[in-house]
């Protein structure tokens, strides 16, 4: 049977590996990744793939061996759905209408209730992308090269905080050593877990969402050099380590001031899969016998992730009241990493970077 520990290992691997590869491609951009979303995509591709394509997915992403045991697969889906229970997500598997689709795969998709199977031409795909607010460039790329198959996965998360954030004027944020911007800030205060982790040269603060269902871990360094060190050394082992677990943090009254941000990123993660060595599903001679008797390949694999930072609509009236609450003040004014975890299982739901909050 699938278990939470096994799934957590895979989610931590996806978090750090995709973060690393996307950062290499766009080092100066904000990033947000939803590992459960990527795991659901890979499970869908595993179900569709055969032979070498399947083995590439299993070997390089260390995914769960799928689905000779339907109960095992169902349990995995159940856990992933629970992790995403407070998010909004839409998954579409588009296949060109000239390709036949096995009834058995249609039944699998219907039973899993995770993705929608859409058959049509490029106009149908573009309409779906438009409904999901994809950018013009990605829509044009689909028109220039009509796809045999595309996957669209959109996920959004926004929630209230256990300790409300309030507006906190505007302050300098040092995007780089040579670029400074003045951006709106928000502030909160409460009994939060916090620590300094020498292994990654980073401060860590745990800020719970309402009802403590999820928490956001903030990883931030005091210098650019140490932030680069953090990016290089934040591994699956670190994300899963009990050293940074909430039970091992110091709890005291602190105030935390951070840039007010809402982050949305859109990636065609096909290039990330290819860099990981997963190439067969994108090859023109790819055979997805579980889906169709006809040959077709995945042309594009779009993932759009969004995390909204809600400040509970409270306006800060007097800055001094926050200064009186605590002598421990954290003012984050350089790039930082955030990780949103599902507290019941300790699973990573989102991992991202704020490079430029503007």
Swiss-Prot record:
One of its GO terms (cellular component) is extracellular space. It comes from Fowlpox virus (strain NVSL) (FPV). InterPro entries: Serpin_CS, Serpin_dom, Serpin_fam, Serpin_sf, Serpin_sf_1, Serpin_sf_2. The keyword Lipid biosynthesis does not apply. PANTHER family: GH10112P-RELATED (PTHR11461:SF211), SERINE PROTEASE INHIBITOR, SERPIN (PTHR11461). Belongs to the serpin family. Poxviruses subfamily. It holds the Pfam family Serpin. Keywords: Protease inhibitor, Serine protease inhibitor. It comes from the Viruses. GO terms for molecular function: serine-type endopeptidase inhibitor activity. This is Uncharacterized serpin-like protein FPV044.
């Amino acid at each position: 049977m699938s278990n939470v520990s096994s799934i957590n290992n895979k989610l931590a691997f996806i978090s750090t590996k995709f973060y690393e590869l996307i950062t290499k491609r766009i080092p100066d951009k904000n990033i947000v990744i939803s590992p459960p979303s990527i795991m659901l995509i890979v499970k869908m591709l595993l179900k569709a793939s055969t032979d070498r394509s399947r083995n590439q997915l299993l070997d390089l992403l260390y995914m769960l061996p799928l689905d000779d045991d339907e109960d095992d697969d169902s349990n995995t889906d159940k856990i992933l759905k629970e992790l995403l229970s407070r998010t909004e997500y839409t998954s579409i598997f588009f296949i060109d209408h000239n390709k036949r689709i096995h009834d058995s795969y249609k039944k699998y998709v219907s039973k899993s209730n995770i993705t929608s199977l859409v058959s049509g031409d490029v106009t149908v795909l573009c309409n779906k992308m438009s409904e999901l607010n994809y950018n013009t460039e990605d829509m044009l790329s689909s028109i220039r090269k009509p796809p045999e198959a595309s996957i669209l996965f959109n996920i959004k998360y926004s929630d209230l905080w256990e300790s409300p954030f309030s507006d906190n004027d505007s302050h300098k944020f040092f995007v780089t050593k040579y670029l400074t911007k003045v951006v709106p800030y928000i502030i909160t205060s409460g009994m939060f877990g916090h620590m300094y982790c020498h292994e990654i040269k980073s401060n860590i603060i745990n800020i719970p969402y309402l009802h403590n269902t999820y928490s956001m871990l903030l990883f931030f360094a005091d210098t650019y050099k140490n932030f680069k060190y953090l990016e290089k050394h934040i591994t699956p082992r670190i994300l899963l380590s009990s050293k940074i677990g909430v039970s091992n943090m110091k709890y005291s009254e602190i105030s935390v001031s951070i840039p007010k941000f809402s982050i949305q990123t859109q990636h065609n993660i096909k290039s990330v899969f290819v860099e990981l060595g997963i190439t067969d599903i994108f090859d023109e001679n790819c055979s997805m016998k579980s889906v169709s008797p006809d040959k077709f390949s995945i042309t594009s694999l779009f993932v759009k992730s969004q995390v909204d930072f809600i400040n509970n609509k409270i306006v800060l009236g007097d800055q001094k009241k926050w200064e009186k609450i605590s002598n421990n003040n954290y003012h984050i004014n350089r790039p930082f990493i955030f990780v949103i975890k599902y507290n019941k299982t300790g699973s990573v739901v989102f991992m991202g970077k704020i490079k430029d909050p503007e």
